[in-house]
């Protein structure tokens, strides 16, 4: 796992991951507030209305992939700025599968970067509303 958390993050929340053997050596702790996203989901959970996005320590984060992770066969790019997701991909060597997540905030604010990223991934995880926003199509069945 590679990422950043702020000094406000409750460290006890990492314990279950560590107990399951997750290598946390790529998680940085930076001075400041952790990323926050607040939303309201509709009844079907296929669309969310973003109420608040606070980037916090993500706004200055530059991922550094530990040497032990560079040749990972599977890479999941979590929901962060697509420019950072691309930076992560430049630091790994030939993964067999690359998946990414994104959200309406990045689709709206970093669309060109996100489209560039999508040329390098095998799988994207988004909900129906994000798919409509990304494709600019209302009919997802097409």
Feature locations, PLM:
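Glycine/threonine-rich flexible loop motifs
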Residues: 50, 86, 134-137
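Short beta->alpha connector loops
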Residues: 6-8, 79-84, 103-107
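A short acidic, amphipathic alpha-helical/loop segment
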Residues: 13, 84-91, 112-116
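Short gly/ser/thr-rich secondary-structure transition/capping motifs
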Residues: 54-60, 102-109
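Conserved N-terminal subdomain of the carbohydrate kinase-like
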Residues: 1-76, 90-95
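Structural motif
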Residues: 74-76, 99, 125
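Conserved phosphate/ATP/ADP-binding segment of small-molecule kinases
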Residues: 93-97, 104-142
């Amino acid at each position: 796992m590679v990422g950043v958390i702020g000094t406000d993050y409750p460290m006890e929340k990492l314990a279950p991951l560590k107990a399951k053997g997750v290598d946390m050596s790529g998680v940085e702790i930076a001075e400041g507030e952790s990323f926050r996203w607040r939303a309201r989901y509709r009844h079907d959970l296929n669309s969310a209305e973003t109420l608040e996005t606070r980037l916090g320590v993500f706004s200055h984060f530059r991922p550094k992939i530990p040497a032990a992770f560079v040749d990972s066969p599977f890479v999941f790019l979590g929901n962060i700025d697509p420019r950072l997701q691309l930076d992560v991909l430049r630091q790994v060597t030939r993964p067999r599968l690359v998946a990414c997540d994104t959200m309406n905030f990045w689709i709206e604010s970093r669309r060109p970067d996100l489209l560039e990223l999508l040329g390098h991934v095998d799988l994207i995880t988004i909900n129906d509303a994000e798919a409509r926003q990304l494709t600019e199509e209302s009919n997802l069945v097409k």
